[in-house]
Amino acid sequence: MKIPTKRISTLLFTLFLLSNHFTAISTAADSLGPKTRCFIEVGDPHISTFLQERRGIRAVKVDAESRCNFLQNNVILTVTIYKVGRFSDHFVKEFRTDPANPKSSGFRVKNWQTYRECMNEQETTYYGVAFSEAKINGKLLRTVKARSNKSKPLKCGT
């Protein structure tokens, strides 16, 4: 079957127009500015050896960091600890970094202050959730919530 030359010309012309159209869209999207590579890393719940050795406190702790390839300012990094319940999970503790603190700015901002003292040694499963809000290049940006990877039972009832 032979395709008429007019159809081939029309098809090629249409493809040419579409390729130019998508190139223009791609160029416009690239001109919006550099893309940030920011993310939250949430550590696994653990019994804090630091608190146990230095303060004599037995506590479950979750650490988190906000990392970005651009300078972050006035970061509020919120970390929440939950324990797994039979029918639903329960809030245990939440801590937010102070945006006015000089340590709340930089390429890497840490929140290692979220912990809850153990009341007994009952085996309990915990997990951490974190998100952050920061000023990057003058714009207020928020991350989606991130959850700790592993939840294992700890001998720490709250």
List each language-model region with its residue ranges.
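Bacterial N-terminal signal peptides that target proteins for export
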Residues: K2-L12
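Bacterial N-terminal signal peptides
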Residues: L11-N20
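Mature extracytoplasmic or otherwise solvent-exposed domains
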Residues: S26-T158
